[in-house]
């Protein structure tokens, strides 16, 4: 006897993201807030962490951070004297390179420079991070780690054995090497052994204020 089958309706439509709308929103945001702030800072950053950036945003709740593609940020501020939102903003956009962002604020310049120059937050390195130091783990027992972790550690490349319920490192092992990018496996090992060698920090490239753009001394020397 043939069993009847229910017709199944398959929706073949696919929801596509509209990157154009996101760009328009960012450009619109820049145009909306540029009159609200006296200073616009251009900064670069290293080893960005969203959770730590969230804390920074909270500390500067009356100011505004903006991130996006440099080309879009340039469009928002203006690429030339003809289309810039404020006099000399095009000079700021000329330096939008690499990983950077914009910081809009009315806070005093000295306060901003003091904060961002001294800001530094340690974290565990991600894959691709280039270490400034070589870290090794010595041969012998691992203290404070349960025996059930041995297989996992070995899978990450650490030469280990289990002896009487204790994990032993069979020989000295390099967790990371100075000047060499960290692998995904090394990233996990460094975290397991509590090595926070990555540092999230900012570098101010320049700032716009009162219709003038000032390039920071360090940046001008590099150029």
Swiss-Prot record:
CDD domains: Ribosomal_P0_like. Keywords: Cytoplasm, Nucleus, Ribosome biogenesis. It comes from the Eukaryota. The keyword Nucleus applies. The keyword Cytoplasm applies. It holds the Pfam family Ribosomal_L10. Its main location: nucleus. GO terms for biological process: nuclear-transcribed mRNA catabolic process; ribosomal large subunit assembly; ribosomal large subunit biogenesis; rRNA processing. It is found in: Nucleus, Nucleolus; Cytoplasm. InterPro entries: Mrt4 (IPR033867), Ribosomal_uL10 (IPR001790), Ribosomal_uL10-like_insert (IPR040637), Ribosomal_uL10-like_insert_sf (IPR043164), Ribosomal_uL10-like_sf (IPR043141), Ribosome_Assembly_uL10 (IPR051742). GO terms for cellular component: cytoplasm; nucleolus; preribosome, large subunit precursor. Associates with the pre-60S ribosomal particle. Component of the ribosome assembly machinery. Nuclear paralog of the ribosomal protein P0, it binds pre-60S subunits at an early stage of assembly in the nucleolus, and is replaced by P0 in cytoplasmic pre-60S subunits and mature 80S ribosomes. Belongs to the universal ribosomal protein uL10 family. This is Ribosome assembly factor mrt4. It comes from Dictyostelium discoideum. The lineage of its organism: Eukaryota, Amoebozoa, Evosea, Eumycetozoa, Dictyostelia.
């Amino acid at each position: 006897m043939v069993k009847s089958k229910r017709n199944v309706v398959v929706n073949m439509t696919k929801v596509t993201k509209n990157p154009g709308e996101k760009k328009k929103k960012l450009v619109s945001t820049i145009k909306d807030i540029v009159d609200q702030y006296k200073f616009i800072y251009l900064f670069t950053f290293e080893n960005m962490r969203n959770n730590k950036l969230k804390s920074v945003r909270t500390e500067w709740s009356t100011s505004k951070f903006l991130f996006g593609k440099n080309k879009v940020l340039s469009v928002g501020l203006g690429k030339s004297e003809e289309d810039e939102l404020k006099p000399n903003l095009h000079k700021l956009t000329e330096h939008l390179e690499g990983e950077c962002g914009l910081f809009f604020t009315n806070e005093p310049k000295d306060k901003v420079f003091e904060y961002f120059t001294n800001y530094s937050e340690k974290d565990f390195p991600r894959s691709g991070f280039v270490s400034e130091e070589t870290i090794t783990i010595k041969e012998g027992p691992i203290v404070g780690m349960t025996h059930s972790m041995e297989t996992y550690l070995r899978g990450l490349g650490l030469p280990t054995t289990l002896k009487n319920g204790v994990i032993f490192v069979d020989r000295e092992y390099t967790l990371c090497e100075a000047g060499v990018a960290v692998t995904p496996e090394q990233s996990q090992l460094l975290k397991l052994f509590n090595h926070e060698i990555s540092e999230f920090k900012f570098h101010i490239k320049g700032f716009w204020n009162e219709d003038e753009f000032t390039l920071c001394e360090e940046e001008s020397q590099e150029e």
